[in-house]
Amino acid sequence: NNKISEFLANNEKQLLLNKEYNPTEYNGYTKFNKEKVYNMIIYLSDKTILKTKLLKEMFYADFLFYKENCKSITGLEYCKLPFGPVPDSFETILSYGDQEDIIDYKPVITPSKEYYEITSKKKFNKDLFTKEELEVLDKIKKYFKNYNAKEIVDYSHKEKAFIDTNKCE
């Protein structure tokens, strides 16, 4: 039933956006920060990006920042899925961003495949980030600039953390 699906989607969105995440090892000892999440998406999308590539770049930004500073940028938790590490509730995050006119999140269907594009609709607010956070975002964006979605997925599958983690953990 469509109404039930809609209710569940709205309920999940409210839980995600209103939850007070206590800093833990799973979120990089950082409270969930919705504004930083969406501004990270805006920055990394740089107009338009494929969903798969965006989700990997978000993972690498949070994890590189954690490696260098013992905390993440966004407070997102990540899990292992077949195409690599992704933020928990990423569909909710992207759908909400689309509903709130922060991003355009749409499928692109070709004769051979279907994929999703994210296009930023807002201006990046660099004031939300520290100098160190901005440096990491820039480093990730530059490093993966010429990677396509498949290449970044393959790259992420070689990570020790990905190999050692069970699916959906």
Report each predicted region and the residues it spans.
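Domain-edge interaction signal
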Residues: 3-169
